[in-house]
Amino acid sequence: MVGRQKRYEVLLTQGAERDLESIYDYIAEVDGKANANDMLDRLMEAVEGLARFPERGSCPKELVALGIKEYRQTQFKPYRLICRLMARQVVIYLIVDGRRDMQSLLANRLLG
């Protein structure tokens, strides 16, 4: 029998919560509430998946270029979830469309 895997607590910053609201509002306006609900459900599954696999994904290349390696990203195309592991917690700072200017978004949210 395989040992039970420890779960991490996943926390969303206020900025990440606002990101989810913005994504929902945009999709609801452009593509309908049903599609917005579906996308929100799938994004939340990705968020909750970090409780079991907090180290999945990679370091954002925009931050690595600045010598910052303590953040990780999980991609849920086209969205990127940017988080940081701290003790037994995964703190999600940013949930955005990866086609946006990530350098500016990361600088404003994480370094600003």
Question: What do these predicted ranges mean?
Answer:
Residues 9, 25-27, 72, 80, ...:
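Compositionally biased, intrinsically disordered low-complexity regions enriched in proline and serine
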Residues 1-70, 112:
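Basic, Lys/Arg-enriched alpha-helical interface segments
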Residues 58-88:
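Basic/aromatic recognition patch in beta-strand/loop cores that engages polyanionic ligands
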Residues 76-80, 84-112:
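Enriched for short, Lys/Arg-rich terminal
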